[in-house]
């Protein structure tokens, strides 16, 4: 049985865009409040009072459109992945599709799969375009992640997102997909039940057999199916709940950390959940050269991983400069204290 996922029509990335909120809180400031002195990251991004997963996704979508340079009416699908949607019952994708001018001849849906909801939407977009049902589809991953006050998730749960417009491979695509693979099991490592405000997790169980098992198996299977080795890749982007986990995966797979660091952003913006690998790949595309190959593996609790092999094309040289780069958002920051952070994130519910 062939495990590789590859459509009959070759598919690429026509445009990409990311967005990270301006506000930051240092892990040291959170630790000051809770009496903690060791931290998994340095600081994380915090959404403003007027920001949520929808607005983050919309900004990323607009940046992707700038790079794509296409009429938004040509986009026949807008699929949004998140675990922090502003509405429990109302699609977010319809709002974004309307705001970018893609309605009414468009399909929209909201995807959920913990931190890999965005790449799940991307897999669907690749199939949609690859089957020739449409020429363009947009996949978005964005989150404003929450952690219970005092829980170790509070140190890492950040905010950010990215959008990718998928189209037929051509001279206008900045990169193309060689193939993809999804690996899924029923592993209850992280969850939030209906009406609960904060998620729960299985502590060390979230590492193995959850994160490491799924990412490593997805990466290895993809490479085996494509006949590639780690030496064939110039960059690798893994889901990044912290800094340690993706670097550990790289070490296990035999990938030098120098190939991982350009797309590893969790140390300065936190874990952006559905946006994590999508923002990381956006950062890599901001600096990659034509011909570079990127290994891209997401992870979502519950649990599963999507793995992609992406090859950069000539169009990247011009298109990367048509919208703000990830570095621009990472360096644009304003620090807040825990009191403002708690207010902005509605940490205390009366």
Swiss-Prot record:
Entries under InterPro entries matching the protein:
ACP_syn_III_C, HMG_CoA_Synthase, Thiolase-like
EC number of this enzyme:
2.3.3.10
Q: Which residues bind (3S)-3-hydroxy-3-methylglutaryl-CoA?
A: 115, 156, 206, 239, 271, 301
One Pfam family assigned to this protein is ACP_syn_III_C
Q: A GO molecular-function term, please?
A: hydroxymethylglutaryl-CoA synthase activity
Alphabetically ordered keywords of this record = Acyltransferase, Isoprene biosynthesis, Transferase
Its pathway is: Metabolic intermediate biosynthesis; (R)-mevalonate biosynthesis; (R)-mevalonate from acetyl-CoA: step 2/3
GO BP terms in the entry = farnesyl diphosphate biosynthetic process, mevalonate pathway; isopentenyl diphosphate biosynthetic process, mevalonate pathway
Instruction: Give the protein's biological function.
Output: Catalyzes the condensation of acetyl-CoA with acetoacetyl-CoA to form 3-hydroxy-3-methylglutaryl-CoA (HMG-CoA). Functions in the mevalonate (MVA) pathway leading to isopentenyl diphosphate (IPP), a key precursor for the biosynthesis of isoprenoid compounds that are building blocks of archaeal membrane lipids.
Family membership noted in the UniProt record: Belongs to the thiolase-like superfamily. Archaeal HMG-CoA synthase family.
Q: Which HAMAP family match?
A: HMG_CoA_synth_arch (MF_01409)
Q: What is this protein called?
A: Hydroxymethylglutaryl-CoA synthase
From the broadest rank down, the organism's phylogenetic lineage runs:
Archaea, Methanobacteriati, Methanobacteriota, Thermococci, Thermococcales
């Amino acid at each position: 049985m062939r495990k590789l996922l590859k459509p009959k029509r070759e598919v690429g990335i026509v445009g990409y865009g990311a967005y990270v909120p301006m506000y930051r809180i240092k892990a040291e400031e959170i630790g000051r409040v809770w009496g903690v002195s060791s931290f998994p990251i340095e600081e994380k991004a915090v959404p403003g009072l007027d920001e949520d997963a929808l607005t983050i996704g919309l900004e990323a979508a607009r940046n992707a459109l700038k790079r794509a340079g296409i009429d938004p009416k040509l986009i026949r699908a807008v699929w949004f992945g998140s675990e922090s949607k502003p509405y429990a019952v109302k699609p977010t994708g319809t709002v974004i599709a309307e705001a970018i001018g893609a309605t009414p001849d468009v399909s929209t849906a909201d995807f959920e799969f913990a931190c890999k909801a965005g790449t799940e939407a991307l897999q669907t977009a690749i199939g949609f375009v690859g089957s020739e049902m449409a020429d363009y589809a947009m996949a978005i991953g964005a989150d404003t992640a929450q952690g219970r006050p005092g829980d170790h998730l509070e140190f890492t749960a950040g905010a950010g997102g990215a959008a990718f417009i998928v189209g037929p491979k051509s001279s206008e695509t900045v990169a193309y997909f060689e193939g993809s693979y999804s690996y899924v099991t029923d592993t209850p490592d992280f969850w939030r039940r209906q009406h609960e405000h904060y998620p729960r997790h299985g502590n060390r169980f979230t590492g193995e057999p959850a994160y490491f098992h799924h990412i490593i198996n997805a990466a290895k299977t993809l490479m085996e199916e494509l006949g590639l080795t780690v030496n064939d890749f110039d960059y690798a982007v893994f889901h990044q709940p912290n800094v340690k986990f993706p670097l550990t995966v790289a070490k296990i797979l035999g990938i030098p950390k120098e190939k991982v660091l350009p797309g590893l952003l969790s140390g300065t913006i936190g874990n952006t959940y559905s946006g994590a690998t999508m923002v990381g790949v956006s950062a890599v595309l901001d600096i990659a050269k034509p011909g570079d190959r990127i290994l891209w593996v997401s992870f979502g609790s519950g649990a599963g991983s999507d793995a992609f092999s992406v090859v950069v094309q000539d169009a990247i040289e011009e298109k990367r400069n048509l919208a703000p780069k990830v570095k621009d958002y990472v360096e644009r920051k304003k620090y807040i204290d825990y009191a403002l952070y708690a207010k902005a994130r509605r940490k205390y519910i009366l």
